[in-house]
A protein has these predicted regions:
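Central I-helix of cytochrome P450 enzymes
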Residues: 210, 214, 277-282, 307-361, ...
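Cytochrome P450 heme-thiolate monooxygenase catalytic core
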Residues: 124-128, 166-339
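Conserved cytochrome P450 K-helix/beta-meander segment immediately N-terminal to the heme-binding cysteine loop
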Residues: 421-447
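N-terminal mitochondrial targeting presequence
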Residues: 1-49
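C-terminal helix/juxtamembrane-tail motif
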Residues: 81, 486, 502-520
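Conserved cytochrome P450 K-helix E-x-x-R motif and the immediately C-terminal K′/meander segment
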Residues: 65-87, 279, 283, 370-409, ...
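Cytochrome P450 substrate-recognition site 1
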Residues: 34-70, 74-171, 175, 202, ...
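Cytochrome P450 heme-binding "Cys pocket" and the immediately downstream C-terminal segment
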Residues: 350-352, 467-504, 508
Length: 520
């Protein structure tokens, strides 16, 4: 049975934090036992906001202690430890960032019911500061209020509606086929009959796969995925996205305006990263716009999301550019890392891998090779992706500023408060998931309720706009990988997560890909 290092090596709280806990009447030992409740479950008395347990009285001191704990990389572990210490709800303030944190699915339901007509999540100050600095429009990811809603309704029809899948699937299937063809070619060129997946070249390949997939859907043409080399512009774009995420994390707790004033390197690097992202997106958008103006009549094939939005003519060009750029930036690291985690788990569970492969082979035969039909016949593959997002979520938490007063765990929380649902912590909570440390895709096939337990893409009208693209891309990728390769891992190498705005592997995931024919 796999054991998670977060249980082996709990994050130790600084003495000043322990003193604050003691002063508030909570018991805290050096071994940080699982308390799971700091309240009376039988009590029906609603307690005031000021009595929510946690570390919220001194934001600057907490920021210093957070830094000492290397919290910029260990946020997910610290959140998990806080839930173990304070129970299913706690309040914290780190620097100028203040929130209430919850973990139970039932409390998540209360939270999302209180998100209001215009759901508002955590404002990523670093991203909005860059756009203000460069005088760029906000996309739908960063907008709020009526402008967000009107833009989102239009984008939903072209991006996330189920009927659009028939347009996306052929494009994503082509990318998946070319990807495995490239891996086969690399194996044939090597002196071995296997391919080491986890070295820098393979990671570049996986990032490039996601870049090619999202660009195919957005622009109707593929960018960056070549059979013999990786396009330098595509690689630069990927590098910029990685740098953007890495430099965002420190600015969650320190105002970007302050870092800009003092000329901090993290701010300069952040600007450089976003400049590269927008420059690449601008070139792609300009090319498509130019092609549309030169063409006459309706396109003979699906032209991509960008062209569809331009022809629809319901959003300004600047609004379209802003949201398409966000989709581009959000569609590379996130999906490629989830796929890499899935391959890692399948390599750790070879029997399960064979079950998924058998399902894919049967689906191929039953659907006669029709990919859209195949996607309806792979419940275990879909369960594997859900299980990956449970154990290795891209985001540490989901956030909402509540539009009305609510009561959670018998505590009153006033309207306007930022409330976070701990995704990473919930996925490891034995009160929510049976044997949470085990990778069991079949848990998602059972008849018991999954009420507010699968939230890897968010929930409600503010869920991930690129959800359909990401889900379909990952399902098709796994189909092709399972049909072509057996995946194995190095023995005795356990990989954990590190926080860089999104959760990433803390060390290279080293896998071996063996072509199916060669391994028989």
């Amino acid at each position: 049975m796999a054991r998670w290092s977060v249980w082996r090596s709990p994050v130790m709280l600084p003495r000043s934090w322990i003193e604050e806990l003691t002063a508030s009447g909570m018991r805290c030992s050096s071994s940080m036992p699982v308390i799971r409740q700091a309240y009376s479950e039988s009590s029906s008395i609603v307690r005031p906001f000021s009595e929510i347990p946690g570390l919220w009285k001194n934001g600057l001191a907490n920021l210093y202690n957070f830094w000492k704990l290397d919290g910029f990389r260990n946020l997910h572990r610290i959140m998990l430890q806080n839930f173990n210490t304070f129970g299913p709800i706690y309040r914290e303030k780190i620097g100028y960032y203040e929130s209430v944190n919850i973990i139970n699915p039932e409390d998540a339901a209360i939270l999302f019911k209180a998100e209001g007509h215009y759901p508002k999540r955590l404002k990523v100050e670093a991203w909005t500061s860059y756009r203000d600095y460069r005088n760029r429009k906000y996309g739908v990811l960063l907008k709020n209020g009526e402008e967000w809603r009107s833009n989102r309704v239009i984008l939903n029809k072209e991006v996330i509606s189920l009927k659009m899948l028939e347009n996306f699937v052929p494009l994503l299937d082509d990318v998946g086929q070319d990807f495995v063809a490239r891996v086969h070619k690399k194996i044939q060129r090597s002196v071995y009959s296997t391919h080491c997946a986890g070295s820098a070249p393979f990671l570049c390949l996986s990032f490039t796969l996601s870049f090619a997939a999202v660009s195919s859907v957005l622009y109707g043409e593929r960018l960056g995925l070549m059979l013999d080399y990786i396009d330098p512009e595509a690689q630069h774009f990927i590098d910029c996205i990685t740098l953007m995420f890495k430099t965002t994390s420190p600015m969650l707790y320190i105002p970007p305006s302050l870092l800009r004033q003092i000329g901090a390197k993290v701010w300069r690097d952040h600007v450089e990263a976003w400049d590269g992202i927008f420059n690449q997106a601008d070139r792609c958008i300009q090319n498509i716009y130019r092609q549309l103006r030169q063409e006459t009549g309706s396109p003979k094939r699906y032209p991509g999301i960008l062209a569809s939005l331009l022809m629809l003519d319901k959003l300004s060009i600047e609004d379209i550019k802003a949201s398409v750029t966000e989709l581009m930036a959000g569609g590379v690291d996130t999906t490629s890392i989830t796929l890499l985690w899935t391959l890692y788990e399948l390599a750790r569970h070879p029997t399960l891998q064979e079950e998924l492969r058998a399902e894919v082979v049967a689906a191929r035969a039953e659907s006669q090779g029709d990919m859209q039909e195949m996607l309806k016949r792979i419940p275990l593959v879909k369960g594997a992706l859900k299980e990956t997002l449970r154990l290795h979520p891209v985001a540490v938490s989901l956030q909402r500023y509540i539009a009305e007063d609510i009561i959670i765990q018998n505590y009153h929380i006033p309207a306007g408060t930022l409330v976070q649902l701990g995704l990473h912590a919930m996925g490891r909570d034995p009160k929510v998931f049976f044997r949470p440390e085990q990778y069991q895709p079949s848990r998602w096939l059972r008849t018991e309720t999954h009420y507010f337990r699968s939230l890897g893409f968010g929930f409600g009208p503010r869920q991930c706009l690129g959800r359909r693209i990401a889900e379909t891309e990952m399902q098709i990728f796994l189909i092709h990988m399972l049909e072509n390769f057996r995946v194995e891992k190095q023995r005795h190498v356990e990989v954990q997560s590190t926080f860089e705005l999104i959760l990433l592997p803390d060390k290279p995931i080293i896998l071996t890909l063996k072509p199916i024919q060669a391994s028989r």
